[in-house]
Regions:
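Active-site loop->helix "elbow" adjoining a glycine-rich segment at hydrolase catalytic centers
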Residues: 129, 181-185, 213-216
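Alpha/beta-hydrolase active-site loop
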Residues: 106, 176-198, 256-265
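Bacterial N-terminal signal peptides
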Residues: 5-14
């Protein structure tokens, strides 16, 4: 199913990076990986592009830890096109179609800093989202955040999909074999920041990692990894989650684990290689485009690509367990985590199961979208979004508290004052959707032609920008988000699970209630808004999405109501039925 991303991202996602800029005329900055010239961006901000932080992970370096690069006498050149790690073309990459795009020579970063800044400034290190299968550093423009909050912002690329997270006996060299190559890329980029960010006016002793969706997931991963010690000092997870696989699950020989898709055993077979006899040389000889397209052609549900408990990058006991273990804790690091009030509308908002489409003018133009059953839609969105808060906010923060962390903060993003159009009521269909908060943090509306609907030029939107940028800037400076328009933002604890509802025009509020998956499942059990198959699908998603899948919870739910319902097969049947009737399960 194509998601709402297709409508809103392709219509102008890359506009942020595409604005014309001129060289600043300043002397190049000489880093330990090359000399780089700055460009003058809007708002009297300097930006440095396409700085390598490791050797290209190609040939023998594929599926290995990033290797240090040391080239100080080379003048680096800004690339003509965005540097993108191999991935399938998609709305997130800004390229339409189904082909593989990108290059394995992709380990680069950008730096944005206020012009003429005095003294070492807080550093904000952005980790992009995209399910760890898509996305890149050029997607967002944090120049306004840098200027108004007086911070230095670093954005990075990291390996994605099967090139970023992969385990196979042919690649193992005995105990200590690693599998989380994308995570190691992020760690390598943080190492570059420690060595070089002072040259750009940044403070290497005050680095805040922040990321959204898979980026938030990776932020939490760095809190669990023993290899990231000392590389950052504060952390913000936006719509993150905690999930991982054991090496045995990730390999999944002969599909030992029936619910795990895209295991490396099956993946090797899909490449046309003998899974029993394949060698590291065989795997590294495969074309990167073939690797990406083979991966995306394989059936999948929710289980990959996954962080792998390799015992090196991520402790063998597991990602979730490591977050709660004082052995791996970084207790001096303040952490803020949050979720959005209507997370899942980004995926289901154009699904024909939930919406109708009419073409009042012509089918060559986007359809007019309306909800089939607004009450059922809102209920579905509410439960799934509460589930995201439970698994991506309350659970990890509670784990961190038990590991010894003292400064923890939580939020829920609620802003939904979009301007409705003739074609779609954005506030009703989308609302406070997944990723919609990012525009307020960067201080720049995205989404091109429909940006004026998504983020209208209103007092409400301006107020929200001020709230978000101020809170994130405060956190980077002090480790606390500070008050919101005079309202104190109390820290989070298991006994007092405070979170700030982030909304504009006086609608913000401090609350203290934790989301719990079992309670949410009980709410679903009591509901009369869903039919039998919808109840099972929602129970399955709440039990298996975002956190480590709890298949037993699903089997036992509501006295075993859905124990004999194969939701994966059911969803496939529904999708195929929609495709047969409409040609696609999406309204686009």
């Amino acid at each position: 199913m194509r998601s709402l991303l297709v409508l809103i991202l392709l219509s102008g996602l890359m506009a942020c990076a595409a604005s014309s800029q001129k060289p600043s005329g300043a002397d190049p900055v000489v880093t330990d990986t090359g000399s780089v010239r700055s460009y003058l961006a809007e708002g009297d901000v300097l930006q440095w592009y396409d700085i390598p932080f490791a050797q290209p992970p190609v040939g023998e370096l594929r599926w290995r830890a990033p290797v240090a690069l040391s080239v100080t006498d080379q003048l680096l050149t800004r690339m003509d096109e965005p540097v993108i790690c191999p991935q399938q073309a998609s709305s997130v990459s800004g390229v339409e179609g189904d082909a593989a795009i990108g290059t394995e020579d992709c380990l680069y970063l950008d730096v944005t800093a206020p012009k003429g800044a005095d003294g070492p400034l807080p550093v904000m290190f952005w980790i992009h989202g995209g399910g760890n299968t898509s996305g890149h550093k050029n997607t967002y423009d944090f120049s306004r955040l840098a200027a108004e909050q007086n911070v230095v912002v670093v954005t990075i690329n990291y390996r994605l999909g099967p090139l970023g997270w992969f385990t196979h006996p042919a690649l193992d060299s005995g105990p200590g074999a690693i599998a989380n190559f994308g995570t190691l890329d992020i760690i390598a980029a943080l190492g570059w920041v420690q060595r070089n960010i002072g040259l750009f006016g940044g403070d290497s002793d005050n680095v805040t990692i922040f990321g959204e969706s898979a980026g938030g997931h990776n932020v939490l991963t760095l809190l669990a990894s023993p290899l990231s010690e000392g590389l950052f000092h504060k952390a913000i997870s936006q719509s993150g989650y905690v999930r991982s696989l054991s090496p045995r699950q990730a390999y999944n020989r002969e599909r030992e684990f029936s619910q795990v898709d895209r295991g490396s055993w099956e993946f090797t077979q899909a490449l046309g290689l003998d899974a029993r006899a394949v060698t590291a040389a065989d795997l590294r000889a495969e074309d990167a485009s073939n690797i990406i397209m083979t991966y995306f052609d394989m059936p999948s549900d929710h289980s990959s690509p996954g962080i792998i408990n390799d015992g090196v990058v991520i402790p063998a006991e597991g990602f979730a367990a490591a977050l709660a273990n004082p052995k791996y804790a970084k207790p001096s690091v303040p952490v803020m985590a949050g979720a959005n009030n209507e997370e899942v509308t980004l995926w289901i908002g154009l699904n024909r199961y939930f919406v109708d489409a009419a073409y009042p003018l012509t089918k060559w133009l986007p359809p007019k979208v309306s909800l089939k059953d607004p009450e059922m839609y809102k209920f579905w969105v509410r439960q799934r979004s509460e589930g995201w808060k439970a698994q991506g906010v309350d659970r990890p923060l509670t784990s961190l508290e038990s590991a010894g962390y003292k400064s923890l903060y939580a939020y829920r993003y609620d802003w939904n004052d979009q301007k409705d159009s003739f074609l779609i009521k954005f506030s009703e269909v989308l609302g406070a959707a997944h990723a919609s908060e990012i525009s307020f943090i960067q201080g720049k509306a995205m989404y091109g032609p429909i940006g004026s609907y998504m983020y209208p030029d209103t007092e409400s939107a301006a107020d929200m920008t001020d709230i978000m940028m101020t809170a994130w800037g405060n956190f980077a400076r002090t480790g606390a988000p500070g008050a919101v328009k005079g309202s104190a933002w109390a820290p989070y604890s298991a006994l007092a699970p405070h979170y700030m509802v982030l909304d504009s025009m006086g609608q913000h509020a401090l609350r203290a209630d934790a989301a719990n998956i079992n309670q949410i499942l009980a709410t679903v059990a009591e509901s009369t808004l869903l039919n039998d198959r919808e109840r099972c699908i929602l129970a399955w998603e709440l039990s298996t999405a975002l956190g480590d899948p709890a298949y037993g919870t699903y089997q036992r739910w509501n006295g075993g109501e859905c124990a004999n319902t194969d939701v994966r097969a059911l969803r496939k049947t529904i999708r195929e039925s929609l495709e047969e009737e409409f040609g696609t399960a999406s309204v686009l």
